[in-house]
Amino acid sequence: MTFTLGPRAISAGYRLEAFEQVGSTNLEAMARAREGDRGSIWFVTAEQIAGKGRRQRPWISPRGNLACSVLELLNVAPAVAATIGFAAGLATEAALRKVSLEAALRAGPEAFKYELKWPNDVLVAGKKLVGISLDAEAVDNHLAIVAGIGINVVAAPEETPTPAISLAALGVQIGAEELFSALSDSWVEFRGIWDNGRGFGQIRKLWLERATGLGRTVGIKSAGSTVEGTFETIDEQGCMIVHTPAGRLMPITAGDVYFGSAASAGAV
C-alpha cells in the first residue's frame, strides 16, 4: 500500500510516517511525541495488530481497513484538548461523504447517512463504521494529543458491543489509501475550525447536526454505574446531557452508550 497526504494537508505542513505493519499507530505517535517531535504528523499502517480503542478494547485492523493516528502538540488544558475528538468525528464523516458520493448517488442519500455517536464513533444505519480513540500525555511544556481513527473499509469485526459494518458491505469500493488522503485534508479543515478549542462552539453546532440519538432514550454504563434518560444535547465542554426520569439534567463525561430498546439492556 502507498499512503500519501492530501494536497491540503501537505500545504498545511503535515508530515507522514507510513508502515506496512505496526502494533498500534497511537503508540507510535505518542512515542514520537516523547522523543520531541513537534506534532502535525500522521501515522498510518496497512495492518495494525495490537491496537487499543476506547476503554482499552482490542483494535485490530486487517489489511484493507484504515488505521491511522494524528499527533498534535497543544498548549491548552486537558479538558479543552479532549474536545478535539468532536473535530475528528466531523473530519472523518466529511471524508466518508466525499469518497462515497458515487455509491450514494446509486443507492440514495438515506443509505449513506453517516451519523456521529457520542463521544467518538461514526455509524451507518445504527452500525459502527468508525471508532476514534484519544490519548493525551504531558510532554515538556505541551500536551501531546493523539487521535487514532479506525475505519472498516473492507471488513467489519464480529461480536462487538455495537454491531459493525464496512464500506464494502455498503457497496463503496474505495481503497484505504484514497480514504486516508481525503481524511488528512478534512482534518485540516476541522482542526482549523476547532482552533485549539476557541471554535468549539461551531464544532458543537456541526456535530449536533449530524448526531444520532438526540431526543431518544439512552443508557450509559460507566465504572459499574448506569444512567438512563433522554439524550438532550452536548454542552460547551462536550459532555452528553441526559434528562433523567427524576427531571435532572445530568452531564456525562464518559461511558458506553446504548440507544432505544438497547438502552436498558446495554446498561445492565
Predicted regions located by residue number:
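N-terminal lobe of the biotin/lipoate ligase/transferase fold
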Residues: 1-113, 249-250, 265-268
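Long, positively charged amphipathic alpha-helical accessory segments at protein N-termini or as interdomain linkers
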Residues: 2, 9-12, 82-114, 124-268
